[in-house]
From Swiss-Prot:
UniProt source species: Shewanella pealeana (strain ATCC 700345 / ANG-SQ1)
The keyword Hydrolase belongs to this UniProt entry's keyword annotation: no
PROSITE patterns in alphabetical order: ATP_GRASP (PS50975), SUCCINYL_COA_LIG_3 (PS01217)
UniProt-listed GO biological process terms: succinyl-CoA metabolic process; tricarboxylic acid cycle
UniProt subunit comment: Heterotetramer of two alpha and two beta subunits.
Function of the protein: Succinyl-CoA synthetase functions in the citric acid cycle (TCA), coupling the hydrolysis of succinyl-CoA to the synthesis of either ATP or GTP and thus represents the only step of substrate-level phosphorylation in the TCA. The beta subunit provides nucleotide specificity of the enzyme and binds the substrate succinate, while the binding sites for coenzyme A and phosphate are found in the alpha subunit.
Gene3D superfamilies linked: ATP-grasp fold, A domain, ATP-grasp fold, B domain, Succinyl-CoA synthetase domains
The encoding gene: sucC
Catalytic activity annotation: succinate + ATP + CoA = succinyl-CoA + ADP + phosphate; GTP + succinate + CoA = succinyl-CoA + GDP + phosphate
The UniProt record lists the keyword ATP-binding: yes
InterPro entries: ATP-grasp, ATP-grasp_succ-CoA_synth-type, ATP_grasp_subdomain_1, Succ-CoA_synthase_bsu_CS, SUCC_ACL_C, Succ_CoA_ligase-like_bsu, Succinyl-CoA_synth-like
Binding site for substrate: N264, G321, I322, V323
Cofactor(s) demanded: Mg(2+)
Official protein name in the record: Succinate--CoA ligase [ADP-forming] subunit beta
Domain (ATP-grasp) ranges: 9-244
Length: 388
């Protein structure tokens, strides 16, 4: 689950980190009033969406004119912002963040992720702030400095100082940076973050450290113990199909291909997508129905897959370990009848009662293609998607 910038900065403020005074506004009038409340003669207005690249897409504006703030809010509120990180539809803008303007002398980067290779939270800092950290990692990886947090000892001030030295901070800035580092590390653990970015973390004209931006991703598996964070969820930013799938405990991710995939098990699902690609097809989705697949869940899975008009064929790949293949076959038949599937369906069954499952499919009156192997399934579904 992701947070909006204004939500991230509210958390920063709770932990005593330096952020700009700002207000998230629902209307153009609120945005104008927020600028008046903040005071000063320059403000920054930002569209609030779960995507980067807002500035290049026109979703960020620096202005000294309140009427320009009104015009900006009237233009964007209720519309979709399309950036390089969104699909062609973009994401809806329901709030505008109005902030005081900060004079920038230098831009830095500070972020943290859960690194699965080290099984630790890893902080990353760089002098290359304001640009995509992925670009820095690819082109100049030596400019990214890391601090690995030991879960037994927790974050240590010396780690912040080490990063600060590498960033070229002076003694005053070093103290401020250490406070930011320690606060972020505590926040990361307290709220079960999966990702944290401040890009840019700036040095102001006065020489102070300031959190100019904020990006937070939460570990969805931990939301049960994070009620405050869970209440910050903005469903309007979610893919409608992914949100619908979550209600039925289906793991679904929309892609841009034409072969729908329904699989039980995340690893098998990824392998299925790979082999579809290998045989010249393009998966339209990742969909894991889980180990406890039922007729109802299979039916919902079909509905979700077929809600994508790009899908020209569906591959169902089931390994019967926890579930019986004959039961899954009956579920597939029931789902196809209920949903009214009009595209070719290729089914590959292996494992418990696989032969019985294939027999159930063969005895149905439906035009379901039974595959003899995973390779055969991939070849059949790619041909079907191409209309062959």
């Amino acid at each position: 689950m992701n947070l909006h910038e204004y939500q991230a900065k509210a958390l920063f403020a709770e932990y005593g980190l330096p952020v700009s005074e700002g207000f998230a506004c629902d209307t153009a009038q609120e945005a104008v009033e927020a600028a008046g409340h903040i005071g000063g003669d320059m403000w920054v207005v930002k569209c609030q969406v779960h995507a980067g690249g807002r500035g290049k897409a026109g979703g960020v504006k620096v202005t000294g004119d309140k009427e320009e703030i009104r015009a900006f809010a009237e233009h964007w509120l209720g519309k979709n912002l399309v950036t390089y990180q969104t699909d062609e539809k973009g994401q809806p803008v329901a709030k505008i963040l109005v902030e005081s303007c900060t004079d920038i002398a230098n831009e830095l980067y500070l972020g943290a992720v859960v690194d699965r290779s080290t099984r630790r939270v890893v902080f990353m800092a760089s002098t290359e702030g304001g640009v995509e950290i992925e670009t820095v990692a690819e082109e100049t990886p030596e400019l990214i400095h890391k601090a690995i947090i030991d879960p037994l000892t927790g974050p240590q001030p010396y780690q912040a100082r080490d990063l600060g030295f590498k960033l070229g901070l002076n003694p005053t800035q070093m103290k401020q940076f250490t406070k930011v580092f320690m606060g972020l590390a505590k926040m990361f653990e307290d709220h079960d973050f999966a990702l944290l970015e401040i890009n840019p973390l700036v040095i102001t004209d006065e020489g102070n450290i300031h959190c100019l931006d904020g990006k937070i991703g939460i570990d969805g598996n931990a939301l049960f113990r994070q009620p405050k964070i869970r209440d910050m969820h903005d469903p309007s930013q979610d893919d409608a199909r992914e949100a619908h799938a979550a209600k039925f405990e289906l793991n679904y991710v929309a892609l841009d291909g034409n072969v729908g995939c329904m699989v039980n098990g995340a690893g098998l699902a990824m392998g299925t997508m790979d082999i579809v690609n290998l045989h010249g097809g393009k998966p339209a989705n990742f969909l894991d129905v889980g180990g406890g697949a039922t007729k109802e869940r299979v039916a919902e899975a079909f509905k979700i897959i077929l809600s994508d008009s790009n899908v020209k064929a569906v591959l169902v790949n089931i390994f019967g370990g926890i579930v019986r293949c004959d039961m899954i076959a009956e579920g597939i038949i029931g789902a196809v009848k209920e949903v009214g599937v009009e595209v070719p369906v290729v089914v590959r069954l292996e494992g418990t009662n696989a032969d019985l499952g294939r027999e159930v499919l063969a005895n149905s009156d439906l035009d379901i293609i039974a595959a003899t192997s995973l390779t055969d399934a991939a070849e059949q579904v790619v041909k079907a998607a191409e209309g062959k």
